[in-house]
Amino acid sequence: MSLRSEARVNTSTLQKIAADMSNLIENLDTRELHFEGEEVEYDASPGDPTAQEACIPFSSIYNTQGFKEPNIQIYLSGCPVKAQVLEVERFTSTSRMPSVNLYTIELTHGEFTWQVKRKFKHFQEFHRELLKYKAFIRIPIPTKRHTFRRQNVKEEPREMPSLPRSSENAIQEEQFFGRRKQLEDYLTKILKMPMYRNYHATTEFLDVSQLSFIHDLGPKGLEGMIMKRSGGHRIPGVNCCGHGRACYRWSKRWLIVKDSFLLYMKPDSGAIAFVLLVDKEFRIKVGKKETETKYGLRIDNLSRTLILKCNSYRHARWWGGAIEEFIQKHGTDFLKDHRFGSYAAVHENILAKWYVNAKGYFEDIANAMEGATEEIFITDWWLSPEIFLKRPVVEGNRWRLDCILKRKAQQGVRIFIMLYKEVELALGINSEYTKRTLMRLHPNIKVMRHPDHVSSSVYLWAHHEKLVIIDQSVAFVGGIDLAYGRWDDNEHRLTDVGSVKRVTSGQSLGSLTAASVESMESLSLKDKHQSHKNEPVLKSVNDTDMKLKGIGKSRKFSKFSLYRQLHRRNLHNSDSISSVDSASSYFNHYRSHQNLIHGIKPHLKLFRPSSESEQGLTRHSADTGSIRSVQTGVGELHGETRFWHGKDYCNFVFKDWVQLDKPFADFIDRYSTPRMPWHDIGSVVHGKAARDVARHFIQRWNFTKIMKPKYRSLSYPFLLPKSQATAHELRYQVPGAVHAKAQLLRSAADWSAGIKHHEESIHAAYTHVIENSKHYIYIENQFFISCADDKVVFNKVGNAIAQRILKAHREGQRYRVYIVIPLLPGFEGDISTGGGNALQAIMHFNYRTMCRGESSILEQLKPELGNKWINYISFCGLRTHAELEGNLVTELIYVHSKLLIADDNTVIIGSANINDRSMLGKRDSEMAVIVQDTETVPSVMDGKEYQAGRFAQGLRLECFRLVLGYLSDPSEDIQDPVSDKFFKEIWVSTAARNATIYDKVFRCLPNDEVHNLIQLRDFINKPILAKEDRLRAEEELRKIRGFLVQFPFYFLSEENLLPSVGTKEAIVPMEVWT
C-alpha cells in the first residue's frame, strides 16, 4: 500500500471516529450530571469592562453566517451583558400537573434593553446544553469549526456556575426571592465567560442574533425560533397565497421583530430569507380559524400573509401580543393612515434643497456618492453608466458615473440599482447593456431589471421613478434620470462643438475669444477641400504633432487638428471618450499626444467672458462650452471644452438614440444639428424623509427579488430599512439645504411594488394643493394630459385648476395660473411634415386638456369668463437660439420638469407627469416629495406684505429669472407673482414678444398660423428671415429676453391628431398615450 493510500485510510478513520464521538456527545444524557460546581467569576471582556463599546457596522447585515459558526459577531465588543430577574409569574392549574413559574429577565447590552420570559425547565435545558458543550470542547475532533472553537477557548476557564437543584414545587412562596437571586447570579456569571456567552445555545436562550445590536436597525425587538409556512406572497397573476395544505411546507426559521419590519433568517446559513414591512394594513391574528393551523399566528401586511406555528395556544397568544405591543410602541407612524393616502408620514424639520437643471443636481449626487460609507440605492427609468456628473471634464474619468460606482464598491460600499426593463420593440434605452456594464465592475454592485413582461403580463406600464439614496440618510428625488441628454445648466446651449487653439505670446485672451469663431470657420473651409484625401490629412496631423513637440515654427499652428472631417469619418469606430472627446482627443485616437493631455490636466484653468448679455446673439459665445487655458512647454493652449460627449449630445425629436453600447460615438452631426436643451427640476431630502424614500426602494427591491427566480440567490440580498430613531444622525449633509416640513408621495400598485391596494397620493396631493391655493400656482411638466371625462382621461388635475379659477372669479379674487410645458412632445418625428403618429397623439391630448373640446380647461372657463380667462391662466413653452457653423439656428427647450409651486410656501417635486399614467397609481410607478415651508422671509403677494417660504419662493424666483432672462439682472422686481404689472407687463408680454420674434426670424413650428397639413406644406416652403437677411435677423434676435414663449393654441387645430387606422400606433391601447 502506498503512503498516499495509507494517509487516505488514516484520514477516513479519523473522520469516522470524530463522527462517532460527536454522536456520543450529542446523545449524552446529562441529567445524570451534577448541577453543583465551583462558582467562578470571570470577565473576559478585553481591557476595561467599562470601556466604550464599539458599534457593529450596518454593513454587517450582508455578511451574516450560520448560527453555529464559532466566529460570528453578535455582541458589542468591550461591552458586558447584564441580567436581572424582574419578576416571577406563577401559573396554577386545577389538574394534577404541578404549578409553573415564569421568570421575566431583563437584559442590558450597551444602549439595548430587552426582556425574555423563561421557565425553570428552560434554565435546566440550557445548563445541560452548556455541560454538553463543555465536555464536547475537550475532544480533539479534526474539523475546521471544532478546531477553531477549541483554539479560541484554550486559555479560558471552563468551570461553570451552579444551578439550583431543588424542584420548584418544593420551595415555598417566601423562597421565590432567593430563587430569583440564584438564577440572576447564574446568568451573570455565564455571561461573563465568553466561552459560554458566544455559544449558540446561549444566544438562543437570550433571544439574540447577529442583527440584534446594530445601531441603525433601532431598538432590539423580539426574537426567537419559529416554524413558518411557505407562500402567502401577493404576486400579480399568480395564485400562491398558501391556502390549502397541499401547496405549502413548514420550515424552521429565526424570527426578528424590529421597529418597522419583521424578518426571518435561516439558522443553518444565517441568510435573511424574507423581510415584511410594517404598514397601515399590518394585522396580527391568532387561532386555527384565522390561520388554518393549530397554535397558528397570522401576520398580514399589504404584501403578504405570513403564517407561523407555535408550541401552544398560549405561546401563540404571547407572540402575537408581544409583537403588536412592540410595533405600537416603536413603529406607530407606519400603522397610521397618512395625509393624501401616502405610505409615509409628514415629517417636521427636514433639510431639503431644490435644483433647477441637472448641473447642480448631478454635482451634489457625485459628492454625496463620494461620501457614502455603507449603501447606495439608485433607480431610474433610464441609466447611462458613462455619463459625467461634473462638467466640464477636467479630471479625466473621476466623475464619470460608472467610475464613481466602481470606486465606492472597491471601498466596500454596497450598491443596489433597479432599472426599468423596457419593451425592446418600443424603446431603445437598452437596459440590458446598462446592467451588464455595471455588474461587471465589481461584485458589490447588484442590478435588477423589472418587470418581466411575459410572466407578469405588464407590457404597458413603466417604472418611472428617479431616485438616488445615500446610506438611507440622503435621498435625491425628482425628474432627472442619470442618463444621456439630461445634463444642462442655465445657459441651455444649443451647440457643443469644442475647439483648442494656441495663444501666441503677443496675443491676448480677450482678442482670441472675440476672434475664435471667425478664425475657426475660415479654417474649416480650407479643411473641407482636403477632407476626402487621407494622405494630406494625416500629413497635416503629423506636422501639427511636430509643432506641439516644439519642432517647427509656431506661427504655422492655429488649430489642433482637422477634427471635424476625421470626426465624421471615424464615428463608427469610437468606443471610448478618448477617441471622440474633443479636438485634443483626436491625438489620443492617433497615438500622438496622450501623455501631453494627461500631464496638463491638473493645470487647467476655467475662464468665462467678463461680460455676457442674456439677449440675442451675444449669448452664442457661451454656447460652445466653457473656455479653458493650459500652460505648456510650447506656449498656452486655449479653447473651449465639450460638455456633452458622444451619445450625450442629442436631439431626440430629430433622431432617437441608437447604438448605446458605443457611448462615446456621436449619433447625430453636431456641426449641422443643434442639440435639444433639457430643462428639469430635482430635490434632495435628509433624515426621516430620506428613510421613507429608501423604504420605498427597499420594498420594490425585495418584491422584485421574490418575484423573479434569477434574483433569489444569496448574491442578491434582501434589503433592510434603517430605523427612524437614528434618522437624525446625518453623516453627510448636502450644502445649501433649508429646514421645512416634508412628506413622500408615490404612485404604486401590485405590479410595481407588490402591494394589495394601489396608492395615488401624488394625484391626491396635486388636486389638494391646487384646490386650497390662495394666490397662484406655477406648474412645469413634461405632459399636460388631464380634465377627466371618466372615459379616456381620469385624473382631475385640470379640473381642479378650472374650478379654482372659477372660484376666484366668483369671489372677485386676483389669482394666477402659470403652466410651462414643452412646445412639442419628446418623440422622434419630423414636425415639418406633421410629426410622427406618437408625437401627434400626445399633442392631441395636450390640446384636449388646454383648449380643444368640451372637457378642456378653457372650455370649462368660457361660459362664465368669456375671454377674461386670459387674466387668470397662461400657457407657455421655452425656446432658444444660437449660431452653428455660421448659420442662425433655433430649437425648443425640452421641459421635462414635474413641478408644482403654490403660494410661495408649498412645492411638489417628483417624477410624476400630469397624465393618467403617472397619477392614477395603477399604471407607472412614481415618486415625489411635497415640501411645505416653516422658515419664512418678508415678501409681497398681491401688493400686500407676505411671509413667503424660503424653499418655495427661492425655487419660484430661480425659475422665473431663468425663463424671463433675469438671472444677470436682479434689478427687475418679480417678487409679486400675482400683480397685474408682473403677470401682464412682464410674463405675458415677454412670452408674446419672444414668440413673435422667433416666428418672424425662423418661422418656427409649432405655429398658430398653421391649422392643417396643407397650410403646413405652404408654411415650410416660404423663405425665413434668418437666411434671407442675416443682419435684420440678428437685429430682431437682440430683442429676445430669456427663453419664455407663448404656447401656440391653434397649431393643426383642424386636423385629427389621433393615430389613423392602419398605423401601428392605432393598435396601441389609448391608455398608453394618456
From Swiss-Prot:
Bilayer topology term: Lipid-anchor
MF term (GO), any: phospholipase D activity
Gene Ontology CC, one term: endocytic vesicle
Domain PX stretches: 81-212
PLD phosphodiesterase domain sequence ranges: 459-486, 891-918
Protein function: Function as phospholipase selective for phosphatidylcholine. Implicated as a critical step in numerous cellular pathways, including signal transduction, membrane trafficking, and the regulation of mitosis. May be involved in the regulation of perinuclear intravesicular membrane traffic.
Record's protein name: Phospholipase D1
Gene: Pld1
